[in-house]
Design a protein with these regions (language model features):
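Alpha-helical scaffold segments in soluble metabolic enzymes
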Residues: 9, 82, 103, 153-157
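Donor-nucleotide binding loops and adjacent catalytic segments primarily
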Residues: 1, 112-201
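Hydrophobic/aromatic beta-strand patches that form the interior of the parallel beta-sheet core
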Residues: 23, 46, 73, 94, ...
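Generic structural signal for helix capping and beta-alpha/helix-loop junctions
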Residues: 55, 100-103, 176
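A nucleotide-sugar donor-handling region in carbohydrate enzymes
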Residues: 69-147
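Active-site and donor-binding regions of nucleotide-sugar-utilizing enzymes
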Residues: 1-90, 97-98
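Short linear motifs at secondary-structure transitions and domain/linker junctions
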Residues: 19-22, 46-50, 69-71, 107-112, ...
Length: 201
């Protein structure tokens, strides 16, 4: 339903503003709506990070956006080769790398004092100069009915870690994310792990 409504709204937006081109990234359902709207209005579509294989519903969305796109900026040689095998003209496929790596390389080595609170951190304030583990668990979109068992396995493995700080990133908003969020709140509210910090994204 969200995708359908987004197509309607984006079609109106593009009709009003007539952009020279539209840039979309990866495999989010909202980007599929953008891609469909732009394509049917004959607006050139540029896709970042096509050709990646995940084995989930996201992969179907990503490949659908690829087939609607006119120009492709891929992150890896493997992705480039995959798009060409899918029938894309190699003259329209450019190996540019992953934009997120560029962002990470520009990250500040010294964080501001209020970084934790400003970025919606919850729990103990981490000491970034010490060793820490980053944990992130998103629901598997094609098997979201198994989310509870999967997050419990991740939590059970994580609670055994006591001698190192853990920074846990909140899940995305895909189907099953509410189950993950609820289990993380149980840990947080009951203070079951004193060495953990949470970041909501």
């Amino acid at each position: 339903k969200s995708t359908g409504l987004s197509i309607i709204e984006m079609s109106t937006f593009f009709e009003n503003y007539r952009p020279d081109a539209v840039l979309v990234i990866a495999d989010r359902f909202e980007n599929l709506a953008v891609a469909i709207a732009a394509s049917y209005l004959n607006i050139p579509l540029i896709h970042i990070q096509g050709g990646e294989v995940t084995g989930s519903i996201d992969e179907k969305v990503r490949h659908s956006i690829t087939k609607l796109s006119d120009i492709h900026f891929v992150a890896t040689k493997r992705s480039r080769d995959f798009l060409i095998k899918m029938g894309e003209n190699k003259k329209t496929v450019f190996l540019t790398g992953c934009p997120s790596i560029d962002i990470a390389s520009q990250a500040k080595s010294k964080l501001p004092k209020n970084f934790f609170v400003k970025n919606r951190g919850v729990g103990n304030v981490p000491k970034y100069k010490e060793k820490y583990i980053v944990v992130m668990h998103h629901p598997e979109t094609t098997k979201f009915t198994q989310t509870y068992n999967q997050i419990r396995q991740t939590i059970d493995a994580t609670v055994k870690i006591r001698n190192i700080k853990i920074i846990w990133l909140w899940p995305n908003i895909d189907a099953g994310s509410d189950i993950i969020s609820k289990q993380l709140r149980v840990i947080r509210e009951n203070k079951l792990m004193t060495n953990i910090s949470f970041f909501k994204n």
